[in-house]
Structure formats: C-alpha cells, structure tokens
Amino acid sequence: MSATAEVLVISSSPERNPVHTPAPPAYDPERLFGLSPVDVETTPLPSPSDLFCPPTHSRFFEVGNQVDELRRDETRKKSSTLTNDDSAVTTLEGEPATDKPKRRGRPKKEQKRATEELGPCVTGNEKTTTKKTITGTSKKRAQPATKRSKQANKTISGRVAKAGTPQVKEAGEKAICPSTPTTALPLKATNDVLEWERDGLQLEQAMTRRLDWTPTVNKVKEVVELEGKSGSDDNTRGFGNLLSEYGFNGAAAPVNDFMASVEGGPTKRRRIELVDPGVYPAPRQSVADDSEKDNTEGTRKSTPAARKKPTKRANKFTTLTARVTAKYINESTEGSDVVDEETPKAKPKVSRSKKKGQASKSYEPEFVVLSPEEAAKSLDDQELVFGTCSQLEREDSPTTIRELQAAISESERSMTLEASGRPHRTQSKGSSSTVSRFNGSGNLWSVASRDVDGSLMQVEVVDLVNSPDRSGTITLDERPSNAKRVAEAECNTSDINPTQKGSDQAKAASTSETQPVVPSTTQSKNKKAENTTSIARKPDPKMPQYDNFTDAQLSKQAASFGFKPLKNRKKMIELLEKCWKAKNSISSEANNENTDQETPAEPESAPEPGNKPKGKGTTRKTTTKAKAKTQPSTSSKSTTEAISTTKSPSNPNSNTTTSTSTSISKPTPSYANVEEIEDSEEDSDPISFPSPSRLLPQTLQTNHKHAHTLPTSNLPSSPNRTTSTSVPKEPEPPAILLPLTEQITKAVRAQSAAHPASSNSNKTHTRKQTWHEKILMYDPIPLEEFTTWLNTEGLGLVNEDREVGAGFVRRWCESKGVVCCYRPRKKE
C-alpha cells in the first residue's frame, strides 16, 4: 500500500508545484511594502498578480463552489490513507515536517475551519503558524488534489467535467478579489446580485430618467384635462402611479399641480407667452367656481352642462391660436356659448336683412359667422383697413363710387336728350366726325361698353373728367351758319391757285380761334373734296423683281437700304421687298408727315382754357380710314403754311392741348390703329404716353416748325407730279432726328397693341412684358436690348427702315422720362 501510495504521490508531484510561483525571497513583503518582519514559515505570495489582492489561501483552497467541496472530500479520504508516510510528505512539500506530534482526528475539522475563515496568509500571530503546523499534513494532502483539479487534464479521470470549472473559477476569483472582502466573498457577491434584481435597481432606466426627468407625457395629458374636466380623476390616479418611483403621494400632488396650472398655465413659460393675468382674469374666477363645486352640491347639477359646453365650442375653433388659448379663457367661452345659443334665432334675421338691408346691423358686434354680404358691410365700418394703396385710397371716401355712378348716369341722360333733340347730327358729315366718339366706331371698345338697353356707354369716364366739353359740342349746333360758310368757301377754293387758297384757309384758321371744333371739320371736307384729284395725280411705282436679281445685286440692294447681305436668298428677297414698300410709302407720305410735325403748334389752343376739343380722338378714327393715302402734297403744304403763319404768335401753352386732333392727316393705317389704342389708354391709364408735342421740348418744336415752313413757301403756283415726287426728298435730311423719336414712340405702342388679348388675359405672369408695360412700371430699360428690339422688330411695326443707335435711344428715353441704363460689362 505504501509503495503504491508513494508512486501515486511522486507521479503527481510535478503537477503540484505552481508553475509561475516565484521564489519566496524575491517577493518578501518586508522588502516590497516596508512591513514588519513576518514569520519565515509563512507561505509567500503565490504570483505577482496577487500582490495587489489581500493575501489569502484561495489559490490552494477553492472558494464557494460545491464541485470543489466534493473534490476536497475526495482529497481528505486520500490524505487519511497516506498519513503514515513521512517521506512522502517531505518529498511533496520540499521541506521537512515539523517535530510536533500529529493528531489524526483533527485535520478534517481544521480544514473545514480554514475553508470557512480563509484567514490572511501574512500575519504576525503565532496562532496561524501553529495552525499550519497542526494541519500541515492535511494541507499537503489537499494541495495536490486542488492542483490536479486546476490542471486536471493528465492522469485523473473525468477530464471533461474538471477541465472547464477550475479555469472559470480561477478567472472568477481574480475578478472578485479586488472588490470584495475575502471573509464573506462568495456569500456577499451572490446576495448583492439577488438584492439588485429583487429591489429593481436598473441602471438603463435610471439613465433615461436622468436625461429626461420631466414627465412630458403627463404634461400633455394635463393640458387635455384643462378642457374637459370629466375624466380628470382617472388621469390623476395614473399620474400618481407614474410618480410612485419618486416617492410622491399619488392623490395630493396632482391636485396641487392642477390648481396651479389653472391660475398660471401648465408651465411658467406658457404662462408668460400665452396668458397675461391683466388681459385674461377669467381663470381665477373659474378656480373659484371649482372650489364652489367641491363645497356645495347645488352647483354640481350645473357642472355637467358646463362640461359639455366647451366640447361644443371646441369644434368651432378654426385657428391655431384659438385652439391653444381656449383652455385659458373659460368664461369667454361660456359667453360665446350663450351667443351660440342665440345664433339659430339670428339666422332668419340675417336672411331677412338681405331683402331689407338694415336689420343685420344690430347683430354685428356679436361673434357670429356672417355671410359674405354682411362681412362686407362690417368692413365698411372698420376704422383701419390694411391693404394696397388703391384699397386705402378708396376707403378714404366711401361715397366716391356712388357719386361716380350718379354722375355717369346723369351724363348719359343728358347725352341721350341731346341726341334726340338734334337728329341731324348723325346725318351731317361735319357733325358726325366730331360726335363719332358718342356714336361709336364699331371696334372692341364700343362693343364692350353697352348698357342694359343696348345703347353705347363709351363716355363713362371721359365725360366725367371733361364735363365742360359738352359746351364745345353745343357751339357747333348753335353756329351752324359759320361752319357751312367756311365749308362752302373751302369747297369753292379747291380749284383756285394755292395763294388764294392759303389766304382763305388762313381766314378759316382765324375763325377757328373762336370756334374750336370747326377747323377739324373744314379740313376734313377740304381733304374729302380733293381725293379725286390726288388719286389721278399720284402714280404707283412698280416694285422691281428681286427674284431675277443675282446674289451680288441683292447684296448691293441690301447695302443701299443699310442692311448686311444675308446668306439665305429667300430671306434677303423678303427683306428687300419690305424695305422697298416701306421706302415708297414714306416717300409718298413724307409731306403728310411734315404737316404732322408742324401741326403740334396748331389751332386747338384757340379754344377757351376750360374746353378740350371733342374731336380729339374721333376725327382721327373716321377721317384717317377714309383718306389714308390719298392726301395731295400741295394742298396739305399750303394749309400748313397758312396755319403756321396764323399760329406762330400764339401762346406756347397751347402746345400741351393741341396735339391729338392734328393727327387727322396722318395716313398710315398702322398709325391710326395705334392712335385708337391711345384713346383707350387716355381713358383708362393715367400714366400713358403723352402726345408727341407734349414730349418734345419747346425749343425743338419752334425750330422744327420754322425750319419746315421755309421750303414749303417755295412751291410753284401749279401743282404737278414732279413737285409732289421731288419735294419730299429735300426736307428728309434735317427731319431724320425728330421723326425717329416719334417712330420709336409709335413702335412701343404698336407692340402693346399687337397683343391685346394676351394683355387682358389672366395669365399675365406667364407672358413676357411689353416695353410699354415695363416703362409704365418704371423698370430700368436696358438700352442695348431696347435698341436691338427697335432695329429688328419694333421699327418694322411702323414701317420704318432706318436703324437707331444706343445713344439716340438714350436721348429718347431722357426726353420721355423713361428710366434707362446700360448693361454692366462683365469683368474678364
């Protein structure tokens, strides 16, 4: 038995010694920590990692594991069989055993006591040394077993079960060692974990509470509670349950919070932003009502009705502000509910007020949703109306529209009476030209302005502004003999030489100073009488066949007109045809243009200061269409000579009033259409282009007038074809500047007239603005773009072939008061 025991002990002896345990003198506690000298027989620290742990025998005695207890029992049984062999003990321990007698009945009790106490290994007491000597054999027998259980993979059976547990335990011991006391380590570690789980110390929930400790969900519920008080008790219980973790009383705390929130709002910030105690004193009274509800039972009967009312009112809130501030104003909602109860009675009265028109004024101060008609009436009574300038200007005098309509109706009534009293007005040619504005010209403007009876309403605005003009039309009928006399005189002088004719027309111009409307009628009759002679005298030149020309000839013709040769032959031919037509029309109508340039200083200043001639826009419409290109050059020049001689000493202030009727002799149909649009603009737009005479400076008008009266006085006595064709070439060079200014004005207006439908459409934001609209809106006009538009498209609308430069356009803009600028050059 002893031999076999020795073999067993020797075979396991290399495994028993700890591999990484250093020599005892190397880690002497006296040398390392400066401790008091200890007994030599004490066991040294097992490893460097255990230096910072309290010294213990836990490396050789496993702590708190039932599997290790079973192993110790096995080792005790083995140690009891091997106690007789002293040599084996000396070989196992590496040092001789003590001389004290060994008691075999004590080792089990001492070993149990050591496992329970786990006393420190570094002590200065003699008890520990004696205890070690007494239990030396038991420890020496237990150490191989424990070491085998840690290594546990060489000779002992059950390797699978014993391989995992000691290694896990060794790691667990190192983790528990620095944080827990050694005496109660296993029990306290397990008990603390159980207590944490039982008490509910959950760090994740604590972190969320730390980050968001204000109960936001309860705040939302409390806001809902303020509107409807019926379910407040249930919600207060839930609020107390939520705060049970914080140790609050579930019944008392929500009541106090609720009372405070009624006075000042749920939070301090809301009270500052939304509630002002001086403006809304109602919540305090509602708190007093709530206290009365708790004290008395009689008021409890009225509370259900009061609770139902806010729910009815809440559906009628239409704004976000009303929804938010509803819970702060309790009494105002009750007052508004009283109004709501009266609204069904007020509705039939509102319907009656549509017939009567006065019954609804008593209900205006109440908070009732009004019909659109009633809302419009209430807007009239407001002191402050915020809107655009046009709305505010209209609000200054509410009776302006009524007075305007009354004045329009009176003017229509007076006009119908005059028309019925003088039926010959529509029959006579002279009177029809002046009164044609009242009779209508058959265009879109006249068709659109009709009243209920179908009669024309063209003079709604014009007659209101120029109301004294009716006296000017009456003078035509009061003095018909003078008009007939002048007309007969001019008809008789159509065959006489131009000198006599000029003198007669000078007399006619002198009579026109007393009779403002007569010159337009006499000139129209004079032109009418000479249409046949002008047609016979005026030849129509033939257009050359540009299709037969070569490319070189076409380019030469284009250069003569001032254009560069184009690559496309077809486009070049079309361009030359347009240029030829425009040039011939200008040459045949140059005399008429000269008369137009001279007549701005013409006899319509003669009417009295308050009277504007009625034939202003209508004579243009009637006469220019009938006599577009049939005007004779000699007769027109003689009339301009006579008129200029009679009118030269006249008052220069007449230039502002005499421009529009002088366009009678302007022949081109395009210009007639433009002037027709100008009439509509003068009627509607206060900011429109004034007439050319108003735009040009006084010095330019006088210089231009005197410059062109000189060549017209050198006309021969007998008009013939040569004079009519050769004379227009002479005044053309000095007349380049001024006609171009007028042509630019015509081109700008012609563009707006070319798109009347698009200008009246609702989708104005998708349409590109015309130059006229930009000028009216005071937009800065870029000179480069405006010049290119005039040269490519604009001047072509008025049959003008000449081109303009940016400097000339700038002078035109400055003379018209148009805002213009050059494009800024990009820095390279």
Curated annotation (Swiss-Prot):
Residues 80-90, 428-439, 491-524, 710-727 have a biased composition (Polar residues). Pfam families: Slx4. It is found in: Nucleus. Residues 629-670 have a biased composition (Low complexity). One of its GO terms (molecular function) is 5'-flap endonuclease activity. Keywords: DNA damage, DNA recombination, DNA repair, Nucleus, Phosphoprotein. CDD domains: SAP_SLX4. Residues 1-183, 261-364, 409-439, 468-551, 586-734, 749-768 are annotated as: Disordered. GO terms for cellular component: Slx1-Slx4 complex. Residues 101-111, 138-151, 306-315, 346-358, 613-628 have a biased composition (Basic residues). Residues 675-685 have a biased composition (Acidic residues). GO terms for biological process: DNA recombination; DNA repair; DNA replication. Residues 68-77, 476-488 have a biased composition (Basic and acidic residues). Its main location: nucleus. Phosphorylated in response to DNA damage. Forms a heterodimer with slx1. Belongs to the SLX4 family. HAMAP family: Endonuc_su_Slx4 (MF_03110). This is Structure-specific endonuclease subunit slx4. It comes from Aspergillus niger (strain ATCC MYA-4892 / CBS 513.88 / FGSC A1513).
